[in-house]
């Protein structure tokens, strides 16, 4: 299986590094290219043992999956460059935010199978939650192959294209939202009189430990919370204080704003 990556930014790097580390694919079957920084591309490709090239015809020849990972505003130039070299064997996977399947196909002048994926930065550690939407002509065998590729850097959830906006908000932007919550937790802990480095290190380990509990348990998060909450205890007192605030509405506003912005960007790019 030959994979080609157009764009070698942080997200693309996380994806193909995960694929290589999973041993699902030989590094020699992966080809990278970027817009212009050949020295950086060469250095990175040699470090991973993958191929790199600026020859679009050679890149697309016999390519099974072509990842489109350029910045959205650079895509039109890329499409102008590669459309004449597209073959019937090429299936496309876009990681470009805001560009619809119809728009990408129009720019590439092709009806080849195309999928849009929305990973998050946890792909760097093999734990992305990736939303995916397929064009109607993506056959079941190819879908399974794409799922296997994505599972190399996390988990996958298939949704309709219109619901990728919601996935973008919940899981795509999710790490940043959680980092922000943890930042506030550190600030509040520091206000109690402990040294900031002590609080930050403690909360880092708290997050890791809690994540492992969620991962290893069959219980819901609600039940896990109840299991460590004793009536009249310190945990109950803290939860009672939290219940005075409408946390659900806060997150609804947060996610709603992200969904709306995703839709705005999509309409803007597709114009």
UniProtKB/Swiss-Prot annotation:
It catalyses: L-proline + NADP(+) = (S)-1-pyrroline-5-carboxylate + NADPH + 2 H(+); L-proline + NAD(+) = (S)-1-pyrroline-5-carboxylate + NADH + 2 H(+). Its EC number is 1.5.1.2. SUPFAM superfamilies: 6-phosphogluconate dehydrogenase C-terminal domain-like, NAD(P)-binding Rossmann-fold domains. InterPro entries: 6-PGluconate_DH-like_C_sf (IPR008927), NAD(P)-bd_dom_sf (IPR036291), P5C_Rdtase_cat_N (IPR028939), P5CR_dimer (IPR029036), Pyrroline-COOH_reductase (IPR000304). Keywords: Amino-acid biosynthesis, Cytoplasm, NADP, Oxidoreductase, Proline biosynthesis. It is found in: Cytoplasm. GO terms for biological process: L-proline biosynthetic process. HAMAP family: P5C_reductase. Catalyzes the reduction of 1-pyrroline-5-carboxylate (PCA) to L-proline. This is Pyrroline-5-carboxylate reductase. It comes from Staphylococcus epidermidis (strain ATCC 35984 / DSM 28319 / BCRC 17069 / CCUG 31568 / BM 3577 / RP62A). The gene is proC.
């Amino acid at each position: 299986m030959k994979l080609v990556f157009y764009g070698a930014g942080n997200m693309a790097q996380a994806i193909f590094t995960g694929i290589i580390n999973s041993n699902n694919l030989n590094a020699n079957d992966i080809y990278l290219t970027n817009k212009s920084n050949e020295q950086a591309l060469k250095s990175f490709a040699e470090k991973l043992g993958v191929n790199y090239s600026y020859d679009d015809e050679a890149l697309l020849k016999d390519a099974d999956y072509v990842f489109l990972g350029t910045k959205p505003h650079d895509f039109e130039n890329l499409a102008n460059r590669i459309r004449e070299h597209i073959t019937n064997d090429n299936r496309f996977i876009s990681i470009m935010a805001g560009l619809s399947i119809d728009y990408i196909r129009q720019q590439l002048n092709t009806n080849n199978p195309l999928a849009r994926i929305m990973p998050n930065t946890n792909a760097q550690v093999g734990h992305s939650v990736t939303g995916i939407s397929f064009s109607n002509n993506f056959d079941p065998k190819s879908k399974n192959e794409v799922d296997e590729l994505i599972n190399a850097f996390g988990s996958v959830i298939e949704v309709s294209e219109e619901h990728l906006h919601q996935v973008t908000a919940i899981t795509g932007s999710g790490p940043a939202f959680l980092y922000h919550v943890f930042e506030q937790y550190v600030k509040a802990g520091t206000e109690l009189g402990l040294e900031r480095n002590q609080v930050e290190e403690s909360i880092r380990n708290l997050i890791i430990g809690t994540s492992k509990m969620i991962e290893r348990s069959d219980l819901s998060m609600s039940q896990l919370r109840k299991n460590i909450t004793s009536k009249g205890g310190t945990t109950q007192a803290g939860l009672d204080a939290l219940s005075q605030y409408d946390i659900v509405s806060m997150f609804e506003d947060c996610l709603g704003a992200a969904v709306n912005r995703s839709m705005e960007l999509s309409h803007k790019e597709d114009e």
